[in-house]
């Protein structure tokens, strides 16, 4: 039986085990984000500068990931192409989530093998001067590794957001951030999406659009 919340007029009299889970989880996530921010603030700014300058030069941002990281890639691409915050008016910015086209993904996986699907799409959409951003909570996604490797060999810049020890992807990217958490993907993904949001905010500022409210 699930324990009921025991409350008093002044608030919680004491916490249930489930409330402790809430507190522990959210505080750990907050501390992890703080640690990542303190260790990587300059790298995050460098990522934003790279993306902003790419847009200014007429290039585009290609993003990719698998599972929850695929959702993050689509999330961030949409906020660049459509809108991040309603307080900033700006043109659409060219960002494509390579994992968004299920027909292309399934055809590529069936005909070529899943590990090369993102690479194949980068062959179609990527051009010299573009940026490829790969997300992998373990850093060991072969499909992300392959597209970053292709991008580097074809005049594109590369960014990686990973977790754990960074895996095989960390040293392949021009700019990378490793979220120091292993054992589960959820906390890493929470950091990745926050990093992505900060990058978008900075890109808008660097391109001269009105600062977003917090």
Curated annotation (Swiss-Prot):
Pathway participation: Carbohydrate biosynthesis; D-glycero-D-manno-heptose 7-phosphate biosynthesis; D-glycero-alpha-D-manno-heptose 7-phosphate and D-glycero-beta-D-manno-heptose 7-phosphate from sedoheptulose 7-phosphate: step 1/1
Cofactor: Zn(2+)
The entry's keywords: Carbohydrate metabolism, Cytoplasm, Isomerase, Metal-binding, Zinc
Amino acids binding substrate: 66-68, 79, 110-111, 136-138, 141, 189
Catalysis performed (reactions): 2 D-sedoheptulose 7-phosphate = D-glycero-alpha-D-manno-heptose 7-phosphate + D-glycero-beta-D-manno-heptose 7-phosphate
HAMAP family associated with the record: GmhA
Binding site for Zn(2+): 75, 79, 189, 197
A Pfam family: SIS_2
Listed name of the protein: Phosphoheptose isomerase
One term under GO cellular component: cytoplasm
Cofactor binding annotation: Binds 1 zinc ion per subunit.
Listed CDD domains: SIS_GmhA
Locations listed in the record: Cytoplasm
């Amino acid at each position: 039986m699930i324990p009921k919340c025991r409350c008093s007029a002044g608030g919680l009299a004491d916490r249930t085990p489930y409330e402790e889970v809430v507190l522990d989880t959210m505080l750990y996530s907050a501390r992890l984000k703080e640690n990542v921010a303190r260790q990587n603030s300059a790298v995050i700014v460098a990522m934003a500068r790279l993306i902003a300058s790419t847009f200014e030069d007429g290039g585009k941002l290609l993003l990719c990931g698998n599972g929850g990281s695929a959702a993050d890639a689509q999330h961030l691409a949409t906020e660049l192409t459509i809108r991040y915050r309603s307080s900033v008016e700006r043109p659409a910015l060219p960002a494509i989530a390579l994992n968004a086209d299920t027909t292309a993904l399934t055809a590529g996986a069936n005909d070529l093998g899943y590990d090369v699907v993102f690479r194949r799409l980068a062959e179609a959409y990527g051009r010299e001067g573009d940026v490829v951003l790969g997300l992998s909570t373990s850093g060991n996604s072969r499909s992300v590794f392959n597209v970053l490797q292709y991008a580097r060999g074809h005049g594109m810049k590369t960014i990686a957001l990973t977790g754990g020890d960074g895996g095989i992807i960390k040293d392949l990217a021009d700019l990378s951030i490793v979220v120091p958490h292993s054992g589960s993907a959820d906390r890493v993904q929470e950091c990745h999406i926050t990093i992505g949001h900060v990058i978008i905010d900075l890109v808008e500022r660097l391109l001269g659009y009105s600062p977003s409210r917090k």
